[in-house]
Structure formats: structure tokens, C-alpha cells
Design a protein with these regions (language model features):
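Aromatic/acidic, Gly/Pro-rich catalytic loop(s) in extracytoplasmic/lumenal soluble domains
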Residues: 81-138
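Membrane-proximal, lumen/periplasm-facing interface regions of secretory-pathway glyco-
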Residues: 2-51, 55-78, 125-129
Length: 138
């Protein structure tokens, strides 16, 4: 009986530690690509037929976005050189610039190329940290 009681208490404590304390830690959201999930949700929720979508990202880090937007949305992944070479005559565009080392410089490049564009910063609901910026041309 004592062993069963100890086993039951251990299960309760493990449940609380894993599903309550650990799951609500802000670092958990960073570790599990909160930014990528937020980008995918942002793109899907604001989908417009006349807009071309771009994400300044490549390789492995884009996998969660590709998975979450599969068959829901078309976009192109860009590296920094491709971002600078974006043509001016393509209509309305939305460029997602993830937070990171070159975030500010990439936004400056976009603003210089498309001066009428607007920037929206998207922050984490958990810790308020910048996740990405959405640049929209007019």
C-alpha cells in the first residue's frame, strides 16, 4: 500500500513538473520555434490572392513554416542577396524578416527599395520578445 501511495504521488509530481511548470516556461517556446509557428500563423491568417509572399530564411530553420503552411499558401524563401535583388515591378508584396543578426539592416534595405512600405513588428505573447517583422509594400 505504501509503495502504491508513493508511486501515485510520484506520478502526480511528474505530471505537474512536466505539463504545468515546464510547459509554461518562456524558454520552452523559444526552443520549439515559437517564431516559425508565429510566421506560419501570420501568413495563413492574412492570406490575400493579390499579394506575393517572401520569407528571409533558408534551409532547416524554414522546415516548421513549410510544414504548417503546406497546401495553404505559396511563398518564396529568400537569402540576403535575393532580398536585395527583389524586383520593383511585382505588385503588392509581404516580406517576413525574422528577428536576428541582420534584421534591422534587411528592413532598411526593404524600406530604401519600397519607401511607401509599412513595417509591423510581431512579438511573443509569452515574453514580449520580437519574433519577426512583416514588411508590406503598397
Amino acid at each position: 500500500v505504501v509503495v502504491l501511495l508513493l508511486l501515485g504521488l510520484t506520478l502526480i509530481q511528474s505530471y505537474r513538473q512536466y505539463f504545468i511548470a515546464w510547459a509554461q516556461d518562456a524558454k520552452t517556446y523559444e526552443a520549439y520555434n515559437e517564431g516559425s509557428v508565429a510566421i506560419a500563423n501570420y501568413l495563413i491568417s492574412g492570406k490575400h490572392n493579390d499579394t506575393k509572399y517572401y520569407i528571409v530564411m533558408g534551409g532547416y530553420e524554414a522546415n516548421p513554416i513549410q510544414y504548417l503552411t503546406h497546401n495553404k499558401l505559396e511563398y518564396k524563401l529568400l537569402d540576403e542577396k535575393q532580398l536585395k535583388d527583389l524586383p520593383l515591378d511585382q505588385g503588392k508584396i509581404l516580406v517576413i524578416v525574422p528577428a536576428g543578426n541582420n534584421h534591422d539592416a534587411q528592413l532598411l534595405d526593404l524600406k530604401a527599395k519600397f519607401p511607401a512600405g509599412t513595417i509591423s513588428d510581431i512579438r511573443s505573447n509569452i515574453n514580449g520578445k520580437l519574433l519577426f517583422s512583416a514588411f508590406e509594400s503598397k
